Amino acid sequence: MKKVTMSSVRKTKAEMSALGSGGLMTGTQVWAQEILESGDSNDFTFGIRSFDAGARTKFHKHSGAQILIIPEGVGSVGTDNETLSIVEGDVVLIPAGENHFHGAPDATSMAHITIQKKGSVTEQTEA
């Protein structure tokens, strides 16, 4: 068993890895921290992503479902058919294979915890 407290999760950008604004990311900066070490779970990945105002992922899909938990900020999650506003406390389930994006609007930052099946493959669908 492993307990992770939010106070033990690195919250300053200096303690997180910069994902940049290229590749899957667009807009301003996105920051990342893996919460589980690679040997902690054979089944899941568990990390936090912090989006500066105006940053988002490009459209993409995963071979496994993705769960997003919003611990702070205001953001959006969109598919080919709809865009939802997300706020602190929201939980979003993105089914495997669903084309989507997630990120922060121009005016505010947003962070989300991401939980995925280990080995899930991400395919970027937006240039």
Task: Please report, for each region that a protein language model flagged, where it lies by residue.
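Glycine- and acidic-residue-biased ligand/ion/polar-headgroup-sensing regions
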Residues: 63-75, 80
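Short beta-strand His + acidic residue motifs that chelate non-heme Fe in jelly-roll/DSBH
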Residues: 57-59, 77-78, 99-106
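Short acidic-glycine-tyrosine-enriched beta hairpin
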Residues: 81-97
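A short, N-terminal "cap"/entry segment at the start of jelly-roll beta-barrel domains
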Residues: 1-43, 123-127
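Conserved short histidine dyad/triad with adjacent acidic residue
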Residues: 45-62, 96
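Ligand-binding loop in jelly-roll beta-barrel domains
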Residues: 40, 96-121
